[in-house]
Amino acid sequence: MEIIQELIAADAKRVVDPTLVLTADEWRKISDSSYTPQEEYILTYFLGEQPNGVKAILDKVQGVKIIAINNLFQDDYSEIGPGEFVDLIDHAKLILTDSFHASVFSMLLNSAFVVFDRHDDRYTTMNSRIENLLCTFQLEDRKYDEKIMERLYEKNYKKAYTILEKERASFMSFLNKTLKQ
């Protein structure tokens, strides 16, 4: 924000990502279950290299189907669209990710998730975006650490949803004010 203010000599306002403005029910209206299996599954979606710690979690949950989006070795899920993405997150037992949007949809759809740092030099700035999301919505406990196994399936997002309502109102106020100018 300070950088923007210095560059354009104007006040900058941080608002939530537009994906957070829609409700879970609104996102579910566009969901598409054509790729969603009937059995219980864990969803992995990594944009960078698969981080350390993923294997330990997957070893703990043996016997549960693993769906890996963005995995060259699992063709069934390599070309899903937004509707399938939303549905897979909505019905997963657990999501393991380094993706901002997978984290957003996990929170919105009340799905258990664990966020990992992205280990890819091209995407180092994305970690700060995810950190900001987790901090804003008081979900720092969803970040991978040595004690994550104790809270793997927790989905206590009550505080996050209260904050989200305020953030949505702020977004709409900003949008209305900006459009009137």
Named regions from a protein language model:
Residues 1-181:
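Active-site anion-handling motifs in enzyme catalytic cores
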